[in-house]
């Protein structure tokens, strides 16, 4: 007897439905996308109990005639494409012709639709993939689809659904993302017979964001745009003070489609690097219009993931666009003081020496020297200029082209509108210091609090970055031997130029080992060896921006070690010098780790606390 059998059509449909219909939210997504593709201006979504017993999506799109209404439930029946050539220039959200057939295979579906100008509409009822009713009906132009009893005939799938409240959350997430993708469409969302929201459909994405996320996100938005012959970008990003523990507030849209893409995420991360704390993520609403032939959306059943034909170009455009906007906006966070509390109820956060002070080992003598030189700057010496820089090695050509985007942008800084912090803190009056850690200054109706370590760290970070091509190295007292795996040794030789740029000079030493002859001057021997090993590990990952990250991490660490610390007492001259240097930095608002350098408190806020004004 044969062991291999051809499956019947009913079983095939159920298997295929499993790829398209994971849960009720998948159904809502497919139906809304069909409505958008139909040219709808108004879409209504109604669900009950997480969409398991009932989903309804209605629209005022082009509608269908009787023949199309029946064909729509056939597998791979679509109006979006006609041949395989169309797959290379997809301009619609749907194109496979699987959605309705897959949905109908695992539920009870009722479709009512009418074309413009038709006297009557068409009603089609499908149960478990089989058409059980087809009649004429009276209905408005467009399409209305009701889906009942999801997975009624696949109990194994149904038992893996979450509770209704969780499934409702997934649906709300889908509707939210689709609202953001098409601000020109008015969406009405009703959950368990309660209206959740209505969007205006006026085409203004800021209005949609305000409606969905409230004023906190809306008021924090920075707008940036970029346009070339075949690429158009609009990015709305929250200021650095608005950040989250995950990427849930990052929305990427390419040609109207919500997508996930590592290149876009990497570009956002790199642009915000040093502006927000580590492992925190900004709010970003990114809209891209690009020639459909330059992307591939047909790589995943849900069409969530896409590929760009030129990932590097996309990274560069997104990175520069966001970075430009960060330079143009005032990023000083304003302290919000709750009016209900009086001064005796407000808890003042304390910072212990253990939390704030970086401890130095005996191998960090070079770092201590750099720090002490800060005190001598007022005698005519500039610590971080020629005396601390080696002449550029003639053997060093331009850094690996993975760094090109970052460095090209660094060279363009002068063309970007500089921050206005210099104006804000010019003619200030130094009030004093607090806890030997914070500097308090006053100007007009605002007083500012500056973290002295974060400020100096930012200054040094930008100085070291500008000197990166001439970074100082030193010969080690005792040669440092590093044992490597055979493939790692090959990688080290392949990336020798990059490692030289990072301050490491080495040569092969026996089997699967190298010997470090020179290391960055700012590092002690134990740190230099461990950092070299960490760098080799990261080089194994060929992500687009890793080499940029290696450069960043090295410089950030050096700046942190050399900066003045919390509990260091600074003289008035030193404070003035710190301010002069801070005013000319590219980003005076955060330290390289993304913590705030400066915060502002207004006179009005203080007067409200003391009830001078109500």
From Swiss-Prot:
Keywords: DNA damage, DNA repair. SMART domains: DNA_mis_repair, MutL_C. SUPFAM superfamilies: ATPase domain of HSP90 chaperone/DNA topoisomerase II/histidine kinase, DNA mismatch repair protein MutL, Ribosomal protein S5 domain 2-like. CDD domains: HATPase_MutL-MLH-PMS-like, MutL_Trans. GO terms for molecular function: ATP binding; ATP hydrolysis activity; ATP-dependent DNA damage sensor activity; mismatched DNA binding. GO terms for biological process: mismatch repair. InterPro entries: DNA_mismatch_repair_CS, DNA_mismatch_repair_MutL, DNA_mismatch_S5_2-like, HATPase_C_sf, MutL/Mlh/PMS, MutL/Mlh/Pms-like, MutL_C, MutL_C_dimsub. It holds the Pfam family HATPase_c_3. One of its GO terms (cellular component) is mismatch repair complex. Gene3D superfamilies: 3.30.230.10, Histidine kinase-like ATPase, C-terminal domain, MutL, C-terminal domain, dimerisation subdomain, MutL, C-terminal domain, regulatory subdomain. This protein is involved in the repair of mismatches in DNA. It is required for dam-dependent methyl-directed DNA mismatch repair. May act as a 'molecular matchmaker', a protein that promotes the formation of a stable complex between two or more DNA-binding proteins in an ATP-dependent manner without itself being part of a final effector complex. This is DNA mismatch repair protein MutL. It comes from Thermoanaerobacter pseudethanolicus (strain ATCC 33223 / 39E). The gene is mutL.
């Amino acid at each position: 007897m044969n062991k291999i059998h051809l499956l019947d059509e009913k079983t095939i449909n159920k298997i295929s439905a499993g790829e398209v219909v994971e849960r009720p939210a998948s159904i809502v997504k497919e139906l809304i996308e069909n409505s958008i593709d139909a040219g709808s201006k108004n879409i209504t979504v109604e669900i009950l109990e997480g969409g398991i017993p009932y989903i309804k999506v209605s629209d005022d799109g082009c509608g269908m005639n009787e023949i199309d209404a029946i064909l729509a439930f056939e597998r791979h029946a679509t109006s979006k494409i006609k041949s395989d050539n169309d797959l290379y220039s997809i301009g619609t959200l749907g194109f496979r012709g699987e959605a309705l057939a897959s949905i109908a295979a695992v539920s009870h579906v009722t479709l009512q639709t009418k074309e413009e100008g038709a006297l009557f509409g068409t009603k089609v009822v499908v149960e478990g993939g089989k058409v059980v009713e087809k009649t004429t009906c009276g209905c408005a132009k467009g399409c209305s689809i009701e889906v009942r009893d999801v997975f009624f005939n696949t109990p194994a799938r149904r038992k893996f659904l979450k509770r209704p409240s969780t499934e409702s959350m997934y649906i709300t997430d889908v509707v939210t993302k689709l609202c953001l993708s098409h601000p020109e469409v008015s969406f009405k969302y009703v959950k368990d017979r309660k209206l959740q929201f209505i969007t205006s459909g006026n085409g203004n994405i800021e209005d949609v964001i305000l409606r969905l996320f409230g004023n906190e996100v809306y008021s924090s938005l920075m707008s940036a745009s970029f346009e070339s012959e075949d690429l158009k970008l609009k990015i709305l990003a929250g200021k650095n003070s608005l950040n989250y523990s995950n990427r849930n507030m990052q929305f990427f849209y390419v040609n109207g489609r919500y997508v996930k893409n590592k290149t876009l995420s990497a570009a956002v991360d790199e642009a915000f690097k040093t502006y927000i704390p580590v492992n925190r993520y900004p709010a970003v609403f990114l809209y891209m219009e690009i020639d459909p032939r330059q992307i591939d959306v047909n790589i995943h059943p849900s069409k969530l993931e896409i590929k760009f034909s030129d990932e590097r170009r996309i990274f560069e455009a997104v990175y520069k666009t966001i970075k430009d906007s960060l330079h143009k906006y005032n990023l000083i966070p304003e302290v919000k003081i709750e009016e209900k509390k009086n001064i005796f109820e407000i808890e003042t956060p304390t910072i212990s020496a253990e939390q704030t002070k970086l401890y130095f080992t005996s191998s960090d003598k070079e770092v201590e020297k750099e720090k002490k030189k800060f005190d001598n700057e007022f005698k005519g010496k500039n610590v971080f200029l020629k005396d601390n820089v080696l002449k550029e090695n003639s053997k060093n050509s331009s850094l690996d082209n993975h760094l090109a985007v970052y460095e090209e942008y660094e060279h363009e800084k002068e063309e970007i509108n500089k921050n206005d912090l210099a104006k804000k803190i010019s003619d200030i009056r130094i009030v004093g210091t607090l806890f030997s850690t914070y500097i308090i200054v006053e100007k007009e109706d605002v007083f500012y609090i500056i973290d002295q370590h974060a400020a100096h760290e930012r200054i040094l970070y930008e100085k070291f970055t500008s000197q990166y091509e001439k970074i100082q190295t030193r010969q080690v007292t005792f040669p440092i031997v590093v044992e490597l795996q055979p493939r790692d040794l090959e990688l080290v030789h392949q990336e020798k130029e990059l490692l030289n740029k990072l301050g490491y000079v080495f040569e092969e030493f026996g089997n699967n080992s190298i010997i470090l002859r020179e290391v960055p001057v700012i590092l002690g021997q134990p740190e230099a060896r461990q950092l070299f090993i960490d760098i080799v590990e990261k080089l194994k990952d060929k992500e687009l921006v890793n080499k940029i990250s290696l450069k960043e991490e090295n410089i950030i660490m050096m700046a942190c070690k050399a900066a003045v610390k919390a509990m260091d007492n600074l003289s008035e001259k030193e404070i003035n010098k710190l301010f002069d240097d801070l005013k000319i930095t590219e980003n005076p608002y955060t330290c390289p780790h993304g913590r705030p350098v400066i915060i502002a408190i207004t006179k009005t806020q203080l007067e409200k606390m003391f009830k001078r004004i109500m």
